[in-house]
């Protein structure tokens, strides 16, 4: 069952990264903010993928925790860009929602992995 959740999480994070790249494609004049958003959003899936091939359970947990931190950072950049009116709420609300879904899945996965560690 955990393997199915991990695969779903990997798939969701890949789709999420693609959606963020598409969302930011047309933004002009805010290179540094767009770069930060794209880096954190794509890092989520990269760390989830790395976790699948962790050397140990603690390494697995560490990779998921990094993905979780990147998820929180991505939410920050999305919210900032909304407040600064670089992204409209309408354009980014689904992306922000999806980020929250991934965040909650990561929290649950880390919790389960820590419980299984004991």
What are the functions of these language-model segments?
Residues 1-118:
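Amphipathic alpha-helical assembly/interaction segments
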């Amino acid at each position: 069952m955990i393997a199915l959740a991990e695969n779903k999480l990997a798939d969701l994070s890949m789709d999420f990264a693609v959606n963020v790249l598409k969302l930011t494609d047309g933004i002009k004049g805010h290179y540094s903010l767009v770069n930060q958003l794209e880096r954190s959003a794509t890092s989520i899936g990269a760390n989830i993928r790395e976790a699948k091939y962790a050397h140990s359970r603690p390494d697995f947990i560490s990779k998921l925790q990094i993905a979780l931190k990147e998820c929180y950072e991505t939410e920050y950049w999305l919210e900032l860009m909304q407040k600064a009116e670089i992204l409209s709420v309408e354009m980014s609300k689904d992306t922000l929602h999806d980020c929250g879904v991934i965040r909650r899945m990561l929290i649950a996965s880390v919790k389960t992995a820590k419980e299984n560690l004991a």
